[in-house]
């Protein structure tokens, strides 16, 4: 079975400046994200060993570790695609219509998502997701890398609120970081995720 690998970025580390510094992106990608990838592969190897030995305590421990590190790998893989040096502005098309319908307007959605990000206690993410069962857009505060978002939610847009994502540049002023984030949102990527989520899911079953 193939190992998980660190994805390449579609842009240089410094391409998102001045909104997100090249120093942050380099550390974030080559160190933090890479650590999650290693953690996934290590947890799987330890799970296989624990299963072979019938060690259920070790199985449960490494399943927990796997959830955390795989969550980190998935979240960051989406994060890099959600960003673009040509980003910003607002969504268009069906995604824009869905946001207007379900949040009242883009400005109201942006305010709600921003509040979710700034109000997060500790480490985690703000997430715009598509509820494949109810067929609606929802925002969530995702705790750590894997908690507080129900199964069946397909992530469309995420902002990383772990301190490693902003502290070197914005210190403890999270609000300035989140404000800057909107300038590099890759709405084409978010729209593509929305189109796939709405066309390839039915209830909790992928078509």
Curated annotation (Swiss-Prot):
Belongs to the iron/manganese superoxide dismutase family. Its main location: secreted. Its cofactor is Mn(2+). It catalyses: 2 superoxide + 2 H(+) = H2O2 + O2. It is found in: Secreted. Mn(2+) binds at residues 28, 76, 160, 164. It holds the Pfam family Sod_Fe_N. It is an enzyme of class 1 (oxidoreductase). GO terms for molecular function: metal ion binding; superoxide dismutase activity. This is Superoxide dismutase [Mn]. It comes from the Bacteria. Destroys superoxide anion radicals which are normally produced within the cells and which are toxic to biological systems. PANTHER family: SUPEROXIDE DISMUTASE 2, SUPEROXIDE DISMUTASE [MN], MITOCHONDRIAL. One of its GO terms (cellular component) is extracellular region. Its EC number is 1.15.1.1. Binds 1 Mn(2+) ion per subunit. It comes from Mycolicibacterium smegmatis. Homotetramer. Keywords: Manganese, Metal-binding, Oxidoreductase, Secreted.
């Amino acid at each position: 079975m193939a190992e998980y690998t660190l994805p390449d970025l579609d842009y240089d580390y410094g391409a998102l400046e001045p909104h997100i510094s090249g120093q942050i992106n380099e550390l974030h990608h080559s160190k933090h994200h890479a650590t999650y990838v290693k953690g996934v592969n290590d947890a799987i190897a330890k799970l296989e060993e624990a299963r072979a030995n019938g060690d259920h305590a070790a199985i449960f421990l490494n399943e927990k570790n796997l959830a955390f590190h795989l969550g980190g790998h998935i979240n960051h893989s989406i994060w890099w695609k959600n960003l673009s040096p040509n980003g910003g502005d607002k969504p268009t098309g069906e995604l824009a219509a869905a946001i207007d319908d379900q949040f009242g307007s883009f400005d109201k959605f942006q305010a709600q998502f921003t509040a979710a990000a700034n109000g997060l206690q500790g480490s985690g993410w703000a997430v715009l997701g598509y509820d494949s069962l109810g067929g609606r857009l929802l925002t969530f505060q995702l705790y750590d890398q894997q908690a507080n978002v129900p199964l069946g939610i397909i992530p469309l847009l995420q902002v990383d609120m772990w301190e490693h994502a902003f502290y070197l540049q914005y210190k403890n002023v999270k609000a300035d970081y989140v404000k800057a984030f909107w300038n590099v949102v890759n709405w084409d990527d978010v729209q593509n995720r929305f189109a796939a989520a709405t066309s390839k899911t039915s209830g909790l079953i992928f078509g």
